[in-house]
């Protein structure tokens, strides 16, 4: 065999036999086949060089370009995701971070030359299956993955099967840690169930069968048994790809994920269905921005966290970085919680975050959680008490304490770079709250109200005033006569 024909030996044995049979039957065909192979070899090499050039040019972005906020050590997914590469997917999911759009959440395999296939999580367009965001090295890139109930939905029978699926990325897996927004989406498990039934992946009668099996031990506040089975399946799929998803949705079984509090403004979940809460989530404000404070206990995969979300910017910090917690602005209905935390992103600078307008009915359960994590209550700190005293000396008393507003007003929704401690220099929620001049406008208002009251009293009853003048005049005349 000549050197020109050595390429035949590189073919699979079946294909070799077919080529040899063709050449024996039609000897001139060997030249045509050889030219055909040379043509494809040359064009494939040129295509690879061109693709490599495009990938190395920073000004040229392919369709599968990963946004800067989620880039870094991750490599991009070139072009469309093919059906044979998909491990599983959740189609038409509503994402609210880092982008607001309906996308397919896809776990798929990425095969790179000379490497074994690796699982990748991509957010892809439903029509083209071209990724807008892709996360590689899932086991080391994902910091926290949780499935959460949504405040206001857990009390509604028609909405409690909708959960919030959240992925937080490690800062060292992003090119810019200050723009490292989490991936957050709403998953309607009733819709997922219909999609799986339509695809033939679960039988149509499965829901009825599971409901009958769990009827004797069913929780009235839990999600449907079929949806819980789907979540268990997803957890296994996530784990195969390197992600440990922690589920906090209330269980259909009375022996796990029990709701110890279930209101429109607050939810608490006990994973073991006992008195120990593993999730506490309540409505709160940070400045003028409304949201929810979440507190998560540690588990076998994650450390404990405090989170504020779910409008940008979304905050997350380790409970181990919390120095202490204090309570202020306490009224009959609401109170504020001030968290003092070490911000490692700013050279371990100590920062304070205030979460206000928390309903008093959740104070005990939140305070119990704080104490269970070994966090000190610093409400009677002397520095804070001195500032309150200064306020009292300015003439406002209790009114100043109640009117002092949380200082960190983070209502700049467009600021997606905010993280813990990323406020403007000079801002401090505690400093402004206890500033002796914080209520000076209130003093003026009170003074004006008092002046208005005096004026109103003077002119309130002109007839009575005239009658009083007549009595005085008559008394003087009687004295003169005497």
Curated annotation (Swiss-Prot):
Q: Residue spans with biased composition (Acidic residues)?
A: 408-435, 442-455
- Fetch the CDD domains from UniProt: PH2-like_Rtt106
Location in the cell reads:
Nucleus; Chromosome
Tell me one Pfam family matched here: Rttp106-like_middle
Question: Region (Disordered) spans which residues?
Answer: 47-75, 390-482
Task: Please tell me whether the keyword Membrane is annotated for this protein.
Answer: no
Which stretches does UniProt call biased (Basic and acidic residues)? 47-66
Q: Name one GO molecular function term.
A: DNA binding
Compositionally biased spans, kind Low complexity: 398-407
Q: Keywords in UniProt for this one?
A: Chaperone, Chromosome, DNA-binding, Nucleus, Transcription, Transcription regulation
- Stored InterPro entries: PH-like_dom_sf, RTT106/SPT16-like_middle_dom, RTT106/SSRP1_HistChap/FACT, Rtt106_PH
Chief subcellular location equals nucleus
Highest taxon of the source? Eukaryota
* One annotated Gene Ontology cellular component of this protein: chromosome
Hey, which family's this protein in? Belongs to the RTT106 family.
Subunit-structure text: Interacts with histones H3 and H4.
Function, as annotated, reads: Histones H3 and H4 chaperone involved in the nucleosome formation and heterochromatin silencing. Required for the deposition of H3K56ac-carrying H3-H4 complex onto newly-replicated DNA. Plays a role in the transcriptional regulation of the cell-cycle dependent histone genes by creating a repressive structure at the core histone gene promoter.
What is this protein's record name? Histone chaperone RTT106
